[in-house]
Amino acid sequence: MASSDALLPISAREEEPLCPYTRLPMADPNQETHGPRRRRPFKGLLAVSFGLLFIAFYVALIATHDGSRSNDEGIDETETITSRARLAGVSEKRNDGLWKLSGDRNTPAFEWNNSMLSWQRTAFHFQPEQNWMNDPNGPLFYKGWYHFFYQYNPNAAVWGDIVWGHAVSRDLIHWVHLPIAMVADQWYDSNGVWTGSATFLPDGSIVMLYTGSTDKAVQVQNLAYPEDPNDPLLLKWVKFPGNPVLVPPPGILPKDFRDPTTAWKTSEGKWRITIGSKLNKTGISLVYDTIDFKTYEKLDTLLHRVPNTGMWECVDFYPVSKTAGNGLDTSVNGPDVKHIVKASMDDTRFDHYAVGTYFDSNGTWIPDDPTIDVGMTASLRYDYGKFYASKSFYDQNKGRRVLWSWIGESDSEASDVQKGWSSLQGIPRTVVLDTKTGKNLVQWPVEEIKSLRLSSKQFDLEVGPGSVVPVDVGSAAQLDIEAEFEINKESLDKIIGNASVVAEAEEFSCEKSGGSTVRGALGPFGFSVLATESLSEQTPVYFYVAKGKDSELKTFFCTDTSRSSVANDVVKPIYGSVVPVLKGEKLTMRILVDHSIVEAFGQGGRTCITSRVYPTTAIYGAAKLFLFNNALDATVTASFTVWQMNSAFIHPYSDEAVRALSRT
């Protein structure tokens, strides 16, 4: 069992950076990984050569660093910011080229004015005061405060110069920005202090593992800890003198080894972590055991692998209860527990997950349903919209698992530079296994978001086929909508029993079937948010119910951003997927609207969609809300409540701001 005395405090003497404990070749990605774990001896010249190559690589890594950023041997500073990110081996903003490939490619970019750009800044979503942010890092609850760290560029509204931003909150809604937690000041992270995770030791102290990009652009894992464990704000962090604690193992490229997870306890009392990587086109998750977080033993087996999924970033691994609606600490295991493996796919920029079984004895995991394994085309996703690099943590304060995610922009980089900021975080979500289906997760905004609700209006409306109804709620830029829909039973029975109604469930797709304007027998129907009076700009969030070949109904939950803005330098996809609807359930949705972000939750959070939208005229008081039913044959009854939402308290760092937040 790890003892905090072995780690905290670390003596002031300079320790040599540590090599990984295991120097075995990488496991064959085609090898069966669910048998007993066996230590294989090195055999023959191949193994000796592999070991020597690894030692040479490691010696070169340590010996050649000069302790500072290298412009001539590291990243080419003459490259654009975008290519800097790709050269470094991480994802960056990819929208600039996309709109130019659309029908607007021959048209000059839209001319945004300051009023439009100012409106895009959110009121109750977390984002830095200015400049660029991306991945959530090391979220935790400590001494009465929620801590949120994040990838941050303090110098510009584009990716680069990454450090760890830091903010604290009492309730996950109201925040105070704190000074930067960790900067790129060592050779092993001089090209960026990248994504990492926090682990609580048995005595309540904290260790933080994070990826550093070295002065030679090699991805290594590093250890840090609070300078003063008695400081509830955790203002200062100390990097372990022996960093890096892990370097890329044999067979792994220098830029394919990043984003360590929160550690969990094994049955032997060791700590275990997993780190994302790839072998050729196969996405993999490496596994390491440690006792003191300084030295590590690499397991011969992989936690999991899926061919043709590419690089796995920001891997997350955690238990969920099969029977209860509460969250579980990361180390919990047992017969009533399933485990989630989630990976952020560098190739597609989607966060995929699967439900499965974890084997503590050899550190492997298998999915319950191999046909929807992590990263496969048909696999499950946390969110079917703009949602990436997510990170969960166990909130011991309320016994729940909370999920954060980076919500990037869908506009051009030039617009980001003009407005002076880029990206934000989604509203934190609770995440549990859907105990009704046992096959998927359910996500829901944390309960604290309700504290921002102001005035509300309730509606019960019957909406006939082809109808659009204005919903009188005043300005619709900051809303929380909870709605329940029911298709008229007579219409439903008539369509199900009518052989002439085309079975379309197998062919329908939110993304490819034309959006909310394409009419079917039973849909689409829902809300148009951030709409102008004339509907020239609108973002529909809707259900589409399709009849299958067996006359069974299949329900889809979609968001159509194709008409969200008349601007031509914006990517405007149609998002969505099928949503499970059980017998006897009505169709339900919740929508959070906060200026340029729309978060939608179908059927209690079984299917979620986050969108970034940039209207040019549906802003300020001109932003409206509409209810619509574009079905051909069905009447729909909608019962819903709309709340106006207050702004969150998100302030710069000062003693007074911290005191004010302490009083909430």
From Swiss-Prot:
Disruption phenotype: Reduced carbon fixation rates during the day, but increased respiration during the night. Shorter roots. It catalyses: Hydrolysis of terminal non-reducing beta-D-fructofuranoside residues in beta-D-fructofuranosides. Glycans are attached at N113, N280, N362, N498. A motif (Critical for trafficking from the trans-Golgi network to the prevacuolar compartment and from the prevacuolar compartment to the central vacuole) lies at residues 14-16. Residues 1-108 form a propeptide. Keywords: Abscisic acid signaling pathway, Disulfide bond, Endoplasmic reticulum, Glycoprotein, Glycosidase, Golgi apparatus, Hydrolase, Membrane, Signal-anchor, Transmembrane, Transmembrane helix, Vacuole, Zymogen. One of its GO terms (cellular component) is vacuolar lumen. A motif (Critical for endoplasmic reticulum export) lies at residues 7-8, 9-10. One of its GO terms (molecular function) is beta-fructofuranosidase activity. It is found in: Vacuole; Endoplasmic reticulum membrane; Golgi apparatus membrane; Golgi apparatus, trans-Golgi network membrane. Residues 65-664 are lumenal. Signal peptide: none annotated. Inhibited by C/VIF1 and C/VIF2. It is an enzyme of class 3 (hydrolase). The active site is at D135. Induction: Induced by gibberellin (e.g. gibberellic acid GA) that accumulates in seeds after red light treatment. Accumulates upon infection with virulent but not with avirulent P.syringae. Degraded in a VPEgamma-dependent manner during senescence. SMART domains: Glyco_32 (SM00640). Residues 1-43 are cytoplasmic. CDD domains: GH32_Fruct1-like. Substrate binds at W132, M133, N134, D135, Q151, W159, W194, T195, R258, D259, E313, D346. The chain crosses the membrane at residues 44-64. Belongs to the glycosyl hydrolase 32 family. May be present in two forms, a 70 kDa monomer and a heterodimer of the 30 kDa and 38 kDa subunits. The ratio of the levels of the two forms within cells appears to be regulated developmentally. The LCPYTRL domain (18-24) is critical for trafficking from the trans-Golgi network to the prevacuolar compartment and from the prevacuolar compartment to the central vacuole. The PRRRRP domain (36-41) is involved in sorting to the vacuole. At least two Arg are needed for correct delivery and the presence of two neighboring Pro seems to contribute to the sorting efficiency. This is Acid beta-fructofuranosidase 4, vacuolar. It comes from Arabidopsis thaliana (Mouse-ear cress). The gene is BFRUCT4.
